[in-house]
Curated annotation (Swiss-Prot):
Can suppress the synthetic lethality of the hal3 sit4 double mutation when overexpressed, suggesting that it is involved in the G1-S transition. It comes from Saccharomyces cerevisiae (strain ATCC 204508 / S288c). Keywords: Cell cycle, Cytoplasm, Phosphoprotein. This is Protein VHS2. Its main location: cytoplasm. Residues 211-226, 238-261, 282-299, 401-436 have a biased composition (Low complexity). The lineage of its organism: Eukaryota, Fungi, Dikarya, Ascomycota, Saccharomycotina.
Length: 436
């Protein structure tokens, strides 16, 4: 008897469970609204699911739902496989949402209702992900994709310099001509060599393209240029830019015979005025010759600078500068003791990227240029030097003629013994009374 009763209870329990499975109800909208607060902002309207039963006439109704929490917990493990098989036959269609009155009446009518979420519940999210991030994530998550199979288009600016270094590539694929960059790019199809295409376009690239267009427009209409327009970024510092790889943009080593080009540097006007004011004060105190002052005053023009460089290279000019430096009152002894500073700044589109080695090179170059210009300024012009040499030769000739005349003329002695004049004197007294 006990076994028969137990079997009957088991059969009735299985039949009730099958009836509950056939009379499955969709989830309540009220429960989904309370549990999906954040998802509601990015999801489409909720879909109500309706299972297909073997008996199509057996429609869903509120009265036929007899699901309880106890029965659901006991039968969830046994019917998991059956639910997964029936999930493939689910029809998805949009149902009109229930009103608040119907929800309230249903909850009061059937308080034992329990929400069951189907296993095939899918949410359709809106696509707010950027394409570059989406493509990058798909490549990272794909185990079969290699970096050699991905065609990456790098940026020309330092915003992606970390990516270039991480991949071990010194030059990017975008360091091509400007015409190729501005032309519309057609990405290759996936069938071409089986590679993907990723493009990186940074904010610095956008500014660079804008400035290049502004520069091209400004060259055509230079007379009507806007003074408020920002300067171009042609010399922008970038490892991947092909402009800096040219020899013209590389810093040249310092040399004593060659001076830096005129268009690559400029002289600070405040230091110039201070230097020339110091030289005028030294000249007023009684120090220098007229040739050095004229050389210092005329050394501003480019023609005089070329002349001073020629005088420096010639051996005669170096000898004259050595001779003038040996004088006690020369300007070389005054100015070498207190060297004047002079700075040269190379024109570049971006500041703050120069290394310490370049700064030291520029300082050494400035010292050499300053020393050369000081020596060339102290060298006298050829006209003044010739005049000084001619005067010196004339004085020597005059002294020689006087000495010859003295040797050839007879000597006269003084008759007055009390006279203290020398017997070898060139001028003797003819009258003995005049010595008294």
């Amino acid at each position: 008897m006990d076994t028969s009763n137990h079997n009957q209870d088991h059969d009735s329990h299985v039949a009730a469970q099958r009836e509950n499975d056939n009379n499955y109800m969709p989830p309540s909208p009220s429960m989904s609204e309370s549990s999906m607060i954040f998802e509601r902002n990015v999801e489409d309207p909720s879909y109500l699911y309706k299972t297909v039963s073997n008996n199509a006439a057996n429609s869903l109704s509120r009265q036929s739902s007899r699901t309880s929490l106890f029965n659901h917990n006991n039968s969830s493990n046994r019917n998991f496989h059956n639910l997964s098989q029936r999930s493939s036959a689910v029809n998805l269609h949009l149902q009109p949402s229930r009103t608040n009155e119907s929800i309230a009446s249903y909850q009061t009518y059937n308080p034992d209702f329990v929400v069951q979420t189907p296993l095939d519940h899918r949410r359709t999210l809106e696509n707010f992900v950027p394409p570059a991030l989406d493509a990058g994530c798909s490549i990272v998550t794909d185990d079969t994709t290699g970096l050699d199979d991905v065609d990456m288009v790098y940026s020309r600016r330092p915003s992606t310099i970390g990516l270039d270094r991480a991949l071990g590539r010194t030059r990017s694929l975008s360091s091509q001509s400007f015409d190729n960059e501005t032309s519309p790019a057609h990405p290759r199809s996936p069938n071409d060599h089986g590679s993907r295409l990723l493009r990186f376009y940074s904010y610095a690239d956008m500014l660079s393209d804008d400035n290049n267009n502004n520069v091209s427009n400004a060259t055509s209409t230079s007379s009507t240029a806007n003074p408020l327009r920002r300067p171009p970024m042609q010399g922008h510092y970038s490892f991947s830019s092909s402009l800096l790889n040219s020899p013209s943009h590389l810093p040249s080593p310092p040399s004593a015979s060659a001076s830096p080009p005129q268009h690559m540097n400029f002289t600070n006007p405040f230091i110039i005025s201070r230097r020339y004011s110091n030289t005028t004060i030294n000249n007023a105190n009684g120090g220098t010759s007229a040739g050095s002052t004229t050389g210092a005053a005329l050394s501003r023009s480019p023609s005089n600078q070329q002349y001073l460089l020629k005088q420096q290279r010639s051996p005669s000019g170096s000898a004259r500068s050595r001779r003038n430096s040996n004088r006690p009152g020369s300007a070389a002894n005054i100015m070498i003791g207190k060297p004047k500073s002079k700075f040269h700044m190379e024109s570049s589109g971006s500041e703050g990227f120069s290394s310490e080695e370049e700064d030291n090179t520029m300082i050494e170059r400035d010292k050499l240029n300053l020393k050369q210009k000081l020596q060339s300024q102290l060298a006298q012009p050829p006209s003044i030097a010739n005049m000084v040499n001619d005067n010196h030769n004339n004085t020597n000739k005059h002294k020689n003629t006087i000495n010859n005349n003295i040797k050839n003329s007879p000597a006269f002695t003084n008759s007055n013994p009390s006279s203290k004049s020398n017997s070898n004197s060139t001028i003797t007294s003819m009258n003995p009374d005049t010595t008294k």
